[in-house]
Regions:
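ATP-binding Walker
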Residues: 11
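ATP-dependent small-molecule kinase phosphotransfer cores
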Residues: 35-101
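Small-molecule kinase domains that catalyze NTP-dependent phosphoryl transfer to phosphate-bearing small molecules
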Residues: 93, 120-121, 132, 141, ...
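ATP-dependent NMP and nucleoside kinases share a basic, alpha-helical "lid"
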Residues: 92-100, 105-141
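P-loop (Walker A) phosphate-binding loop of NTP-binding proteins
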Residues: 8, 20
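Walker A/P-loop
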Residues: 14
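Hydrophobic anchor at the beta1->P-loop junction of P-loop NTPases
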Residues: 3-5
Length: 190
């Protein structure tokens, strides 16, 4: 069974994923793997350079800060970037998931689970939520981003209210991850 984990920036997705990993559950992090693929997949590198120019790679690494500053101020470029990255990530998910037996419980973490079409791989979906104020405070502390940068990212994601309608379980992390979260997920998924 494959369970999707989604939620906006700063909602607590990664905290939940880390809890699952520490308890032996495999978690595919689409953001982390997209970063890896953008530096390793030759076709994706070529398409990214075609979109942003040769100088978008510095010492063989994608300049993610520059890309972020461009795409979050120009939504059409975010759409174009997503259209070249998401298919490569989907293929990578297929390869990753095929390495597990069908009775193994595995997870896919993605802020853009629905936007990227990664939800097609899932049997159930968990939405991790928190108030916008808490999310902003968490991301400022974690990443040092400005409030304006965070709000720009939030505006480019499907609202939690819409995601909740498409999700099977909603976990609110305003007070942190609930103590019995892991046990609740194990019981719920059966």
């Amino acid at each position: 069974m494959i369970i999707g984990i989604t939620g906006g920036i700063g909602s607590g997705k990664t905290t939940l994923s880390n809890l699952l990993r520490s308890n032996g559950y495999p978690v595919y992090d689409t953001d982390k793997e997209a970063r890896r693929l953008q530096n390793e997949d030759d076709k994706l590198i070529a398409e990214t350079k075609a979109l942003f120019g040769e100088n978008i790679y510095v010492n063989g690494e994608l300049d993610r800060k520059t890309v972020a500053s461009i795409v979050f101020s120009q939504p059409e470029l975010l759409t174009q970037l997503s259209s070249i990255v998401h298919p490569v990530v989907k293929n990578d998910i297929i390869q990753w998931a095929s390495s597990f037996t069908s009775n193994k419980l595995i997870f896919i973490e993605s802020a853009v689970l629905f936007e990227g079409g990664f939800d097609v791989f899932t049997d159930k979906i968990i939405l991790v939520t928190a108030s916008e104020e808490i999310r902003i405070a968490r991301v400022i502390k974690r990443d040092g981003m400005t409030k304006e940068q965070i709000i720009a990212r939030i505006k480019n994601q499907i609202p939690d209210a819409v995601k909740a309608q498409k999700s099977d379980l909603v976990i609110n992390t305003d007070q942190g991850l609930p103590e019995n979260t892991l046990q609740s997920i194990i019981i719920w998924q059966h």
